Amino acid sequence: MTLTVSPTAARTPAEEKARFEGNKLAKRLARETTRAIADYNMIEAGDKVMVCLSGGKDSYALLDILLSLQKRAPFAFEIIAVNLDQKQPGFPPEILPGYLRALGVPFHIETQDTYSIVTRVIPEGKTMCSLCSRLRRGILYRVASELGATKIALGHHRDDILGTFFLNLFYGGKAKGMPPKLVSDDGRHTVIRPLAYVPESDLIAYAQFKQFPIIPCNLCGSQENLKRKEVGRMIQEWDRKHPGRSWNVFNALSRVVPSHLMDRDLFDFVGLKPTGVADAGGDTAFDQIDPEPDTAGPGCASDAPAGQADGMAEQRVVFR
């Protein structure tokens, strides 16, 4: 008689725990991605979603999660994976095609030598990211048109969105971030970021669980002096010392109150006048309370004892 040992019985307790935690993480990522897609109407029936696959952990996770969601979505949509081979030295051209064929996913590899352009134009020691991203974006828009893709899905996550916000805040003087969904400047393409609600730490753990064949970026990954890395370290330090702070900042990006900022294009401060009608959602904590007719009348502040009058003057200074 042959004894058959099931795969589950063959696992060690540590392996079983890792598998359990990995499956729990996968469910959480699917839930957060589904929520972002629904909140911003990222994917609709009949869409052809072009998933930009770089070979990094984020884009691998994005493709993996979207393929999983595609199987149980209440409507049909297509997925095609696209990789831009920028001819970086040491880039292994066989890894992604082999991975995608094994998954049975339609894919397209676009080969463009942007590496030579960037290294020729940008002086040594300077950051290459800006030019590289512009070149890459233009190529991907063209490929999307050629493939008939209706949505371009990028693997940016919560930390990328936060980092971009702080970069614009610190170095650009703008309260500007990285939106979960946008239309390209030429008005022809819709870009979506389904991982907008997912923290990078979860994607790191997911890549380890799934054992994605990660391809390092030798061009920008080696530029350790990037401001984005500095901002990333700041966010990590916050998460370590002040749990919840970075999430509060992230949540604030979707809870903007234009009347309490200073942008005259967002709110009409020039035409702002009292209406005599209380704002139900307003802050009335500092509104003056009308005095009772039988206890005080006009000029009550001047009739008050000296100490009390001084206190009122002090309050006016404090809250001015």
From Swiss-Prot:
- Decide whether keyword Transferase is in the record: yes
Q: If you read the UniProt record, what top EC class would you report for this enzyme, in one word?
A: transferase
| Motif PP-loop motif mapped to chain | 54-59
| Pfam families linked | ATP_bind_3
- Can you state which reaction this protein catalyses? cytidine(32) in tRNA + S-sulfanyl-L-cysteinyl-[cysteine desulfurase] + AH2 + ATP = 2-thiocytidine(32) in tRNA + L-cysteinyl-[cysteine desulfurase] + A + AMP + diphosphate + H(+)
Record's subcellular location: Cytoplasm
Q: Where does [4Fe-4S] cluster bind?
A: C129, C132, C220
Tell me the domain of life. Answer: Bacteria
Q: Which cofactor does it need?
A: Mg(2+); [4Fe-4S] cluster
Query: Which SUPFAM superfamilies does its entry note?
Result: Adenine nucleotide alpha hydrolases-like
Membrane spanning stretches:
none
Which pathway is recorded for this entry?
tRNA modification
- BP GO terms, sorted: tRNA thio-modification
Instruction: State which Enzyme Commission number(s) the record gives.
Output: 2.8.1.-
List the InterPro entries.
Rossmann-like_a/b/a_fold, TilS/TtcA_N, tRNA_Cyd_32_2_STrfase
Q: Could you give the cofactor binding note from the entry?
A: Binds 1 [4Fe-4S] cluster per subunit. The cluster is chelated by three Cys residues, the fourth Fe has a free coordination site that may bind a sulfur atom transferred from the persulfide of IscS.
Q: Which UniProt keywords apply?
A: 4Fe-4S, ATP-binding, Cytoplasm, Iron, Iron-sulfur, Magnesium, Metal-binding, Nucleotide-binding, RNA-binding, Transferase, tRNA processing, tRNA-binding
Recall the GO molecular function terms of this protein's record. Answer: 4 iron, 4 sulfur cluster binding; ATP binding; magnesium ion binding; sulfurtransferase activity; tRNA binding
Q: Which GO terms describe its cellular component?
A: cytoplasm
Sum up the protein's function in the record's words. Answer: Catalyzes the ATP-dependent 2-thiolation of cytidine in position 32 of tRNA, to form 2-thiocytidine (s(2)C32). The sulfur atoms are provided by the cysteine/cysteine desulfurase (IscS) system.
Quote additional remarks. Answer: The thiolation reaction likely consists of two steps: a first activation step by ATP to form an adenylated intermediate of the target base of tRNA, and a second nucleophilic substitution step of the sulfur (S) atom supplied by the hydrosulfide attached to the Fe-S cluster.
Q: Give the record's subunit note.
A: Homodimer.
Which family does the similarity line name? Belongs to the TtcA family.
List, alphabetically, the HAMAP family matched: TtcA
Tell me what this protein is called. tRNA-cytidine(32) 2-sulfurtransferase
Gene name, per UniProt, is: ttcA
